[in-house]
Amino acid sequence: METLAVALQTEYLNKGATLVTQTKTSIPQQNGLPARAEAPKIPVLSLEEGYAYFEGRIVPMSAAKVSIATHALHYGTACFEGIRCYWNEQQQQLYLLKMREHFQRMENSWNVLRMRPKESIDELCRITLELVRMHGYRSDVYVRPITYKSSRTIKLTLSTLEDAVAIYAFPMGNYVDINAGLSVCTSSWRRANSNAMPVRAKVTGAYINSCLAVDDATATGFDEAIMLTHDGTVSEGSSCNLFVLRNGRLATPALSEDILEGITRNILIDLAMQEFGMTVEERRIDRTELYAADEIFMCGTGVQVSPVTSVDRRPVRTGKPGAFTMQLQQVYLSACRGENEKYKDWVTPVYE
């Protein structure tokens, strides 16, 4: 793969790959309904650019295609991860954040979906590192591994199907504005219960629950949705975990609140304790506690650490990003970029 990587990297760079963006068009107000707020530009990688790991090989993105008869396409029988790479300009180095932990979590998802792909976690880490390295990225990057039921059948089953892994990467900066503050709403769509849908696994089919919530939120002018459990307590954002600071105490919904066991969430719990001497409570949080919070922030691979400035059109205190949130964000990003020796074991350097 080493020789292939060099050749493909040269070809890719000579092509002068560019990042494409797409924007949803605003829909004017009709029949008394509010207009859909214009969505932020979301980075999209052209399928003619770059390379991917697909069916056991490194291939051009344009060749990484599945049949319309693929089981995962019909029934959502796939699981995925999102891994960020952070560029350090001073060190001229790109760092993969918690790569092994992401694949270990994917392995947990495999168990839920009765998957047995041929690649081991060690092999997937090596493939990911090589795939990112061969592109020669000198900016922040997002890596998307996905494992899916690749058999071509309409049968409702899991155990008897073939499994395949694919990985691709593309440049991506901030998914949302992490400094401005998010306007969020509590969604009418409840978070899927763990007894009905395995929310601790990142199963693709389960994300229709999130899509419904965030689409309704953005259609009515909000940036994000907060989802409640079937008991009415706070669960998480559409695709991110949530923290509440009140009276100097930091709290986050417990794992039993139908949340994804977030890797960023775990990092922030560690940082809050080690850098700020705080005790983090993992517990049930009532909806009204959001209205009484001193600070709220969301976290995840996509949103990173993003302050929330209003909930259901009620300002969070001053309606501006909280001081603690922004300090925690700064410490987090410093660790992600390999600037803090104490947390160097969290990151994997891409370039030798």
Give the residues covered by each predicted segment.
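Non-catalytic accessory segments adjacent to catalytic cores
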Residues: H135-Y137
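Active-site loop/lid in soluble adenylation, ligation, and acyl-transfer enzymes
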Residues: S150
